Structures are given as C-alpha cells and as structure tokens.
C-alpha cells in the first residue's frame, strides 16, 4: 500500500460527488481506511494533497511525452486528452480556489511541457527566445482556457 497514492485516489473519488471545500480530511481517510495521523504525516491539508496530485499528474505527463518520441502535434493532443480526463478535478479546484492562483499553478506544471513541444516544433526556424516563450504561453493558456470554459 502506498498511502500517498491511496489518499490521492480517495480525494479524486470524493471530487466526483463533492466540491473541494466540502471535503474533509476525515472524509478522505475514511474512504481509504487509514487514520488522520497518516494523512498529516504526508500532507498539511486537503489543498496540499490536491497540489501533490497536480504535481504528480504533470510529472507523469511530461515523462510520458519524453518517452513517447511522438511529434509535437501528438504531444499537444496528449496534453489536451489528459486535461479533459481530469476536468472534474481541475474544475473542482477552480471552484474552490482563486482562478488566477489555479492558472498560475497549472502553468507551472504544464508550461514546461508546452515549452518543450514548442522548442521541438521550432527546430531549424529563426525565432528568438522571447518568441518561443510567447508561443508557449499562448498555447498553455489556450489549453487551460478550454478546460475552464
């Protein structure tokens, strides 16, 4: 048993029926059959667990893209599919925290992945680092906007 993963899975299950602000540590530990001490050993609060889930998802996505060897179009589709599949989680977080904070947090996680894709697509082109950064932000914000709208 991996307690962190079990706690994360419990939170994701609860998010299917409740909003984040209505979910308590008691709900999470009851769902996965551990005690509160176990929760607090790994996380400060429910929001800390949510941040860990987003970090884990972004890292898994980045690893998947790095190892796939696919072209940048497929990589963008992969990111879109992942964001769509986690939409309930993102939207629950969106309703529970400030939109700007959530966007900033998601940009930290997904922004570098998008940047890598943009860099790959720009190989051989005469573009500045500023242009690459602009295009990366444009695509990242567009993808996130599609999730929020």
Regions found by a protein language model. Give the residues of each.
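Contiguous segments within soluble domain cores/interaction surfaces
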Residues: 88-95, 99
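Generic hydrophobic, amphipathic alpha-helix propensity
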Residues: 3-11, 28, 53-57
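Amphipathic alpha-helical packing segments from all-alpha helical-bundle domains
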Residues: 77-78, 99-124, 130-145
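Append "Primarily bacterial transcriptional regulators
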Residues: 7, 26-31, 39, 83
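A short secondary-structure junction motif
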Residues: 56-61, 86, 90, 113-121
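Amphipathic alpha-helical linker/stalk segments
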Residues: 13-16, 23, 53-78, 90-92
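Basic, helix-initiating cap at the start of DNA-binding domains
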Residues: 1-18, 22-23
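HTH DNA-binding helix-turn interface
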Residues: 16-20, 33-50
């Amino acid at each position: 048993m991996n307690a962190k993963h079990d706690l994360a899975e419990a939170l994701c299950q609860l998010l299917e029926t409740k909003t984040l602000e209505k979910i308590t540590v008691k709900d999470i530990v009851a769902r996965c059959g551990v005690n509160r001490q176990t929760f607090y050993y790994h996380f400060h609060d429910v929001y800390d667990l949510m941040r860990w889930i987003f970090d884990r998802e972004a890292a898994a996505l980045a690893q998947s893209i790095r190892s796939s060897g696919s072209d940048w179009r497929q990589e963008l589709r992969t990111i879109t599919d992942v964001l769509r599949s986690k939409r309930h989680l993102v939207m629950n977080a969106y309703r529970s925290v400030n939109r700007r904070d959530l966007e900033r947090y998601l940009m930290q996680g997904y922004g570098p992945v998008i940047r890598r894709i943009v860099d790959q697509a720009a190989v051989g082109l005469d573009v500045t680092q500023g242009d690459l950064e602009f295009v990366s932000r444009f695509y990242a914000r567009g993808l996130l906007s599609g999730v929020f709208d």
